[in-house]
Design a protein with these regions (language model features):
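Conserved ABC ATPase signature
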Residues: 150-154, 158
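Conserved ABC ATPase "signature" region
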Residues: 79, 127-145
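Helix-to-loop junction immediately C-terminal to a conserved catalytic motif
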Residues: 63
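The feature captures the beta-strand-to-loop junction immediately N-terminal to the Walker
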Residues: 48-50
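Catalytic Walker B motif of ABC-type/P-loop ATPase nucleotide-binding domains
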Residues: 175-178
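A short, proline-enriched helix->beta-strand linker immediately N-terminal to the Walker B motif
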Residues: 169-173
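Conserved ABC transporter NBD signature motif
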Residues: 71-79, 91
Length: 274
């Protein structure tokens, strides 16, 4: 099922996240060097690159978990290093994060995991928070019966969905997904892709998705950003990636596996790449 949706020209879109000239080093090793990237409101942006290129480093830097040595990061139009604590709190409440392996607390039930951000940021009665937790579970396709289960009692796909429910706990405007289909079987991964597309369309979410999953890139991403050489090499829809002349991008998006996934209309003149 092709869930891909083209975005409009860039001039018509607000950048919900804007990264300019960001450099990150660990000791003598520079991982990111003068990186620029915009994430547009309402889009699903896939972020790809070779293993070790720095995809997770950028994600953690945007989230404030890594320190940068240069550059600016603006969320919702605000420089995250030049805002007051109250403004930072407001920004944090507009973001949700799904880490690669779910990162659910093993000693807490699914419901208790979902309640963590609510308890941290909101002042609501317990009964209302419990009801909201069940609503979030329903939103990601899990039944109320999952609420009182522990992570060890869940399948891999259920863990991902429960973690996504937690990421949606505060009704964020943007969600950051780190390898959301990693470890899922092809059917489970396709179902998760469909869920992400549905949530974007129904909730108006912006989605920043770090992924190696070619199926996700071809089916749900409006645009794709490619990281290489410590910078963003290219940003654009899948059609732009297929037409790009960078050797790594050509290999990634025109390789044998990509040709098996791509629809014929997405891979023009496919015989050229055989």
């Amino acid at each position: 099922m092709d869930l891909h949706r083209q975005t409009e020209p860039e001039t018509e879109h607000e950048a919900i996240l804007s990264v300019r000239g960001v450099s990150v080093s660990f000791g003598a090793q520079t991982v990111l060097d003068g990186l620029d990237l915009d994430v547009r409101r309402g889009e699903i942006l896939g972020f790809v690159g070779a293993s070790g290129a720095g995809k997770s480093v950028l994600l953690r830097t945007v989230l404030g978990l890594n320190r940068k040595q240069a550059g600016t990061i603006r969320m919702f139009g605000k420089d995250i290093e030049a805002i007051t604590p109250d403004e930072r709190l407001a920004v944090d409440m507009k973001m949700g994060v799904l880490f690669q392996h779910g990162a659910l607390f093993s000693a807490l039930t699914v419901r208790e995991n979902i309640l963590i951000p609510m308890r941290e940021y909101l002042d609501l009665p317990q009964r209302l928070m419990d009801e909201l937790a069940l609503l979030k579970l329903d939103l990601v396709g899990l039944s109320a019966a999952a609420a009182d289960k522990f992570p060890s009692q869940l399948s891999g796909g259920m863990i991902k969905r429960a973690a996504l429910a937690r990421a949606l706990a505060l009704d964020p405007e943007i969600v950051f997904l780190d390898e959301p289909t990693s470890g899922l079987d092809p059917i489970g991964a396709a179902d998760f892709d469909e869920l992400i597309a549905k949530l974007r369309d129904t909730l108006g979410l912006t989605v920043y998705m770090v992924t190696h999953d070619l199926d996700s890139l071809f089916s749900v991403c409006d645009r794709i950003a490619v990281l290489g050489g410590k910078k963003v090499l290219a940003v654009g829809p899948i059609s732009a990636m297929l037409a790009h002349d960078d050797p790594w991008i050509r290999s990634y998006f025109r390789g044998k596996r990509a040709r098996q996934i791509a629809m014929p209309e997405q891979m023009p003149n496919a015989e050229m790449y055989s």
